[in-house]
Amino acid sequence: MSNPELPIKFTDSAASKVLSLITEEENPALKLRVYVTGGGCSGFQYGFTFDEKVNDGDMTIEKQGVMMVIDPMSLQYLVDGEVDYLESLEGSRFVVNNPNATTTCGCGSSFSI
């Protein structure tokens, strides 16, 4: 069930993968941090890391007992987007489906607005 008040979606697939990775690490304090930095072939790029901290101003979304964290600067580029986890012949990875991106590169990790 989705919450229409949240500015970004955290899919079941992404939450399940985060739960699996956290279980492997044996550290339940870990959270998935999603961020945007300058760089990549289109101007901005997405980043994913595990973090134990939630900083002042961070937005958090909890699903399936795990938490996704986004800093306020990155959130402005991700509003109405979706963080998902895909498995395909090309490999498996976390992705951001971002309706604000006007251009994305072939790998999907770089975008422009």
Curated annotation (Swiss-Prot):
One of its GO terms (molecular function) is iron ion binding. Iron-sulfur cluster binds at C41, C105, C107. Disulfide bonds: none annotated. Pfam families: Fe-S_biosyn. Keywords: Iron, Iron-sulfur, Metal-binding. Its cofactor is iron-sulfur cluster. GO terms for cellular component: cytosol. Belongs to the HesB/IscA family. This is Iron-sulfur cluster insertion protein ErpA. It comes from Colwellia psychrerythraea (strain 34H / ATCC BAA-681) (Vibrio psychroerythus). The gene is erpA.
